[in-house]
Amino acid sequence: MTQWYPASPALWQGRDDSIEAPDARRLFQTVTRSEAFFPENWQQKIALMGFACDEGVKRNSGRPGAAGGPDALRKALANMASHQGHERLVDLGNWVAPTPDLEGAQQALRDAVSRCLRAGMRTLVMGGGHETAFGHGAGVLDAFAQESVGIINLDAHLDLRQTDRATSGTPFRQLAQLCDAQSRAFHYACFGVSRAANTQALWREAQWRNVTVVEDLDCHDALAQMTQFIDKVDKIYLTIDLDVLPVWEMPAVSAPAALGVPLIQVLRLIEPVCRSGKLQAADLVEFNPRFDEDGAAARVAARLGWQIAHWWR
């Protein structure tokens, strides 16, 4: 059974510069850490949650270790400067999945996300493998059942695989099937896709599903496509698989990208999403601290989370 645990206060530590000025503060001083999962107490805040699960990565023959991602990212965030938007972050702890119950873990995350959104919060989830996306996305669909939900994925992989059970490579096929079951449109855009990492069958599935696909080679000039996708939906769920970044910026993932999309381009693509007023949920997935020797990759991932919270409108 999936268990919920509050985040350890030891993760939120940093240098205290408050003697310099009242606003010389860092995230460890402005993030609120909750000892109970009760989102109804935190309306209009951003729920920071961890999904400590890499069972989907294991099933997908990937490199395990992403279950340690949420706490590693908290530590990297803690000492970053606190600016506008960061005071809204409330740490609502981790959902910890026992092996091999991926499906139960995804259901627990789905229920938690839906509860947060219905309570008036927004959700920022730290994975975990990209199996995070099915639980997170399903929770968003549940919370906004009468509105069109757009799923924006920055990822080297389409993650539309067809297998006999859920993995880190199946979440968007699962979400498509959920939309089919609910008789609603499946709005999915994937930016940063590597043609070399996706079979022809996956490209065919994306075409059949009317997925907006932008290859890694074309992301330098993709703002118009991003804006067009934003404009056609009511609510947005943004998911960032860190393997969209090039290996020299992000080696600490299950499947490092030989080419990838540089961090600065990723930031330029997500800025209009964050500022759109439509973003309800976001996540960072696939960070694997086992392959981050000096903490540099954690800081790269944390900068993405920092920027999302700062830009979020």
From Swiss-Prot:
Domain of life: Bacteria
Record's catalysed reaction(s): N-formimidoyl-L-glutamate + H2O = formamide + L-glutamate
Enzyme Commission number(s) of this protein: 3.5.3.8
Record-level Gene Ontology MF annotations: agmatinase activity; formimidoylglutamase activity; manganese ion binding
Manner of cofactor binding, per the entry note: Binds 2 manganese ions per subunit.
Residues reported to bind Mn(2+) 1: 130, 155, 159, 241
InterPro entries documented for this protein: HutG, Ureohydrolase, Ureohydrolase_dom_sf
GO biological process: L-histidine catabolic process to glutamate and formamide; L-histidine catabolic process to glutamate and formate; putrescine biosynthetic process from arginine, via agmatine
Record: residues binding Mn(2+) 2: 155, 157, 241, 243
Entry's family note: Belongs to the arginase family.
Database matches in NCBIfam families: hutG
Function according to Swiss-Prot or TrEMBL: Catalyzes the conversion of N-formimidoyl-L-glutamate to L-glutamate and formamide.
Protein name: Formimidoylglutamase
Organism: Salmonella typhi
Gene: hutG
